[in-house]
Amino acid sequence: MLNKLINSILLLAVMAFGVSGGLVAADAIDDITPVTDEMLLNPSDGDWLMWRRTYDGWGYSPLDQINKGNVSELKLAWAWGMSPGGRTQETPVVHDGIMFVQNSSHLIQALDASNGDLIWEYDYDLPDDARTQGVRSKAIYGDNLIIATRDARLLSINAKTGQLNWNKQVANYKKGYSFSSGPIVANGVIVQGATGCSKAQPGGCFITGHDPATGAEIWRVNTIARGDTPEGNSWNGVPLASRHGGSAWISGSYDPDTNLILIGVGQPYPWNMEMAGLKPKISDLRVSNDALYTNSTLAIDANTGEIKWYHQYLPTDGLDLDYVYERVLIDLPFNGKMRKQVVTTGKIGIIESVDRTTGEWLWAKETVRQNIVLSWDKKTGKKTINPDTFPVAGETTVNCPADPGAHAWQPAGYSPLTKAMYVPTVEFCSNTTVKTLDPGEIYTGGGMQTYSRVEHPDGDSNIGQIFAINMTDQSELWQYRQRAPLTSSTLPTGGGVVFVGSMDRYFLAFDDTTGEKLWSSGKLSNALESFPITYTAGGKQYVAIMANHKSGLGRLSSITPEIQLPPDNPATLYVFALPN
């Protein structure tokens, strides 16, 4: 029955997709209120205004119409077919009952969030030689959507009419620069991180601040340190022109009390540290090979772009085990003292907390079996890396985990009800072989390694996991394991339910306290590699998730060959609700 309903709705969605400028009642769009700074600080319960809903990165909604007692009754309410081609890891924005989505083709659409009817659409003309892939998130501020594009531009689009206000080029996409996640607006400044900096571009990536009225750049932070400073001298003597990487490809969080953007920076390139010039370490005592600010949290003043502090989690990364992901801001005691914490989980699968006012390292917790880190200093967090996992040209090492990571771009959600964080992880290993440059060949991007991914020798066939951690004492609250990787962010709600999507095409709901599975959708059209949200429209709560399978998590399919996925299915947005 569910599959028949899905097919019927998808047919209607595909028919609707071709309608340009379709309208609902005129007052439906006129009723949208301008989004103020106060709304971003304290959003309406029924709105979802940014990537993780709130500045603190919790990914939590207080809505409780859907709860532990009735979530098993969820039914498909409507669906929307996205444009074909490319990856669509979409986070819809919902405000005043209107949903805004961005297709991989960069078609921007406004939908009635109660039924999926098209209100308006704006078709951005993405260049043919730019990557036809979606951008993970977007911002809404005032009357306007702020859209990042794959050709490294920022757009301002009127949320009521779909008309373009301004179009600002931030970087040259022909050199490899791109935006894969959208901005946040913090204290009146658009903050955007760049990616694509593995493509042999000198000096790495950057984070920029922009004026929402014009798109004009206000400040720029380079994510690869430079100059004759301890940070600039952390590249083993490698000249700036040969320093690569440091992508900021996941949106940051914002602490209004300190006016700080907390944002992650990715790994250096290439992953072979000998090729990157970071090994062997040179003898100059003034020089380190930490490669700052890669694999770090940067605390940036939202209005000036000044780096107030940084903390590096993994220096000299040769395995693409970056720490670029979500920054979750929580205020909880640690060692008997209330601490303002910023928490993240890197690809190794280790959760780490840092004081977000000072950058002081606080604590760490493993979520999977791993062989990369042997130990860490309990005061500083400095890690002792297993030398047997160092990649060496011409040799193969066993790394647990390796790319695409035990934890990746799909963020953990935090619930203030349970004071627990729900971390989607994958437990696996890889036989890793380093590629080398041929004589005279010049590095032009990429990691320069190959992987053969396998199950962990001490694990079982259930590689997918939700790790629920009690954030008050860092103890395990519960753990759920299954064969298929969990491939979406987790969505905890005021109803005591945690939602998550799976590679095997199921959308799942769990009890936030016990981990009991409470509901599962029927099989949807594809893997659920995206960011579920929940919102209200017309007083009714809905839960939405995008089905699409083209992310790096697909590399895990060699471990689970029995999970068959359609290779060329366009993305589909599914929206669920309780029956009337």
What kind of region is each of these model predictions?
Residues 458-516:
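Loop/turn-rich, solvent-exposed surfaces of beta-rich toroidal or solenoidal domains
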Residues 48-52, 87-107, 130-154, 178-201, ...:
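Repeat-blade elements of multi-bladed beta-propeller folds
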Residues 27-76, 223-230, 385, 455-456, ...:
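Blade/loop signatures of beta-propeller domains
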Residues 80-93, 121-142, 167-182, 222-251, ...:
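Extracytoplasmic beta-rich repeat domains
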Residues 57-170, 493:
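N-terminal cofactor/phosphate-binding cores enriched in small/glycine residues
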Residues 110, 156, 209, 299, ...:
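Conserved blade-register residue in beta-propeller folds
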Residues 533-580:
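Blade-level signature of beta-propeller repeat domains, shared across WD40, Kelch, NHL, RCC1
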Residues 204-216, 283-286, 290-304, 359, ...:
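Beta-propeller blade signature
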